[in-house]
Amino acid sequence: GKKIAVIGSGPSGLAAADQLNKRGHSVTVYEKSDRVGGLLMYGIPNMKLEKQIIDRKIEVMKAEGVTFVTSANVGATKAAMNPMVAKEDAMGEYLTNPEEKAVKADTILKEYDSVILACGASNPRDIKAKGRDAKGIYFAVDFLKTTTKSLLNSGFKDKKYVSAKGKNVLVIGGGDTGNDCVGTSIRQGCKSVVQLEMMPKPPVCRAESNPWPEWPKILKTDYGQEEAIAVFGEDPRIYETTVKEFIKDKDGNVVKAKCVKLAWKKDAKTGRMNMSEIEGSEYEVPCDIVLIAAGFLGSQEYVAKAFGVELNERTNVKTEAGAYATNVPKVFTAGAVSYTHLRA
């Protein structure tokens, strides 16, 4: 068997490590966080995925011979440590892992026969709107991570998370991560929650253009929206809407979001759907906390640069279609590091 390093312990990293170990290879998994699991551990709320399930799988993999190294930021320089740390409020402190150490890519390449990059698509898609620098605006992944980390570390006693208790919450993004933000905010005791979705409201049943066995493009009400309906009496989602401006108070805190309705029209030549703002449709939504769940753009570039692998236009690691090899010999990819999740 070969000595193989897997960089990242999310779903694809764990799957790759598990399969390679079963084929007789010696596998070491490197994780920059203080716990193994990646997205499974910190990106998905506990009420949706109990962490004892992840811990149990990790213990089984350890017993089978897989080695795990946590707080190891492979490819990072001192300046690149904790790249997701937000600058506003106390979020930076909450996200910081004091045990984190930088591990040189050259060291990994020399020590192992092959390397698998399984770092995920961890760059959150930002939004461009006036007032984006207001305090109280966070990426959804940061909000969810600090909440779960505080829960696991102290049962919330350390207060090292951003609480939505008594706050008006605005979630930007209609996907799974946005739904998790809605559910988490409600369980924290938010005053209100609104979830914005740029796309039109899906039909209840399949359209003729969306036959089986295609993925059903229909309206789905997930647990977060169901809880919002139970608590506040209405679905939190507002469709075909986006934010034009964040309004601040005198201290720079976000207090309102100026929204605008959108219209979608198919281009006769290309067949693509084009979006435009509806003139005169602006209105304001009160918000003390804004959570951006607008999808992801690609992997952390410093990891790719450290290993010398090429990136595509989406900042994902470049590989041939249907293949996993990079331009660097013995460096491969697994999972979302080489493709992008567009929705969050």
At which residue positions do the language-model features occur?
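Fold-independent oxyanion-binding glycine-rich loops
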Residues: 9-10, 32-33, 71-73, 118-121, ...
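A structured beta-alpha segment of the ubiquitous adenosine-cofactor-binding alpha/beta core
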Residues: 70-109, 229-233, 240-242, 247-249, ...
